Amino acid sequence: QVRLLRKSTEQTHLCLGTPALSRFHPDRFALELLHVILGANMSSRLFREVREKRGLVYEIGTHIKRFKDTGAFVIYAGCDAGKLSTTIRTIVAELARIKRERIHAGELRRAKEFYSGQLLMGLEDTVEHMLWIGEQAVTVGRVARPQDLLTHIERVTPQQVQRAARRIFVPERLFLAVVGPVPQQQVATLQQLCAL
């Protein structure tokens, strides 16, 4: 599904999202690493391919939301309106690639190290630490130690990351929202581009 809000903006903003895994799903740790590999930092696949290599976007990244019974995986990008179709085509190609090709051990190792570093550094902040405790107490009913989470992350295999990608990146479950100076007649083309 595609939603377009025509607006006279300097750049076109897009969010490509899909329902994802709940905070209790067995593959939730693999999803965290899928997020890191695809778009959590400047070494991620989308940043390197879409921004650095092709110069299509000003900004790109992924975000995940975890809820009790579902979740969301969202890719955000900001680009020129004239580069919108190519940007979406390139993003979708990367999603198809991660479903098709197993992640190399070195890439997974770097993702685990990044995740671990971000978690531990984030918890040094008092507010972040309070949010860590409060969110778990309210949603799960108990508070896990950071080391427990990192143990689960450490056990994730390339096969599990690929399985998570195959589970969530399904063409009929992809939703695209676009804000910018894009003609309404381009919606049909955008829908076709979202087919993995």
Regions found by a protein language model. Name each.
Residues 1-4, 171-196:
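Proteolytic maturation boundary segments
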Residues 26, 83-86, 184-188:
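Short, conserved charged micro-motifs
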Residues 15-21, 51-156, 171-180:
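M16 family metallopeptidases and their MPP-like homologs
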Residues 6-9, 66-67, 168-169:
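Solvent-exposed alpha-helices and their adjacent loops that cap or buttress functional pockets
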Residues 32, 161, 176:
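Short, conserved catalytic/metal-binding micro-motifs enriched in Asp/Glu and His
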